[in-house]
């Protein structure tokens, strides 16, 4: 079973749209996919369920602990498991990284695709990504994808991000 996490720098970055789009694409290609959501969120899993037709579960380190998260992940059936992060990648309980998407990714050894909603920056955006790569050990971030991005902006930003961060940019989702 292949698995990955979709996370972001902050809420409102397009994680749910990206996750649902990926789930729909996998299903359309004949793959059995399962979705999970970090934390105690019960709204986003309803979107996952709508796309897949099967329930989506939560991975919640605060409530389940590390063993519970690993057990939940191992129980999933199918070819792919897509885990959607919550809030910003390092945002956990009470302003700490405890029970954050980063901690879930680290606990479950999940590679992370970071969804980035570009604003009015380019090199500064690369600096923010580099900060995410280094603020904690073993960030698990392996790929980038731009969300709410126009083709011309993608053509400008992708090479900058790849050169400055060393991470491949997979593509973009239009606004």
What is the meaning of each model-derived region?
Residues 112-115, 170-171:
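Short hydrophobic alpha-helical runs that function as membrane-insertion/retention elements
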Residues 2-108, 116-143, 151-155, 162:
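ATP-dependent carboxylate-amine ligase catalytic core
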Residues 145-149, 173-174:
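Short, structured patches in soluble enzyme cores that scaffold and shape functional sites
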Residues 166-175:
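Beta-strand-loop-alpha "switch" segments that mediate conformational coupling across diverse proteins
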